[in-house]
Amino acid sequence: PDNFMRF
């Protein structure tokens, strides 16, 4: 998946 704003 896309790791855009993963904290």
From Swiss-Prot:
The keyword NADP does not apply. Keywords: Amidation, Neuropeptide, Secreted. It comes from the Eukaryota. In larvae, expressed in the CNS and thoracic perisymapthetic organs (tPSO) but not in the ring gland or abdominal perisymapthetic organs (aPSO) (at protein level). In adults, expressed in brain and thoracic-abdominal ganglion but not in corpora cardiaca and corpora allata (at protein level). Its main location: secreted. Belongs to the FARP (FMRFamide related peptide) family. FMRFamides and FMRFamide-like peptides are neuropeptides. This is FMRFamide-like neuropeptide PDNFMRF-amide.
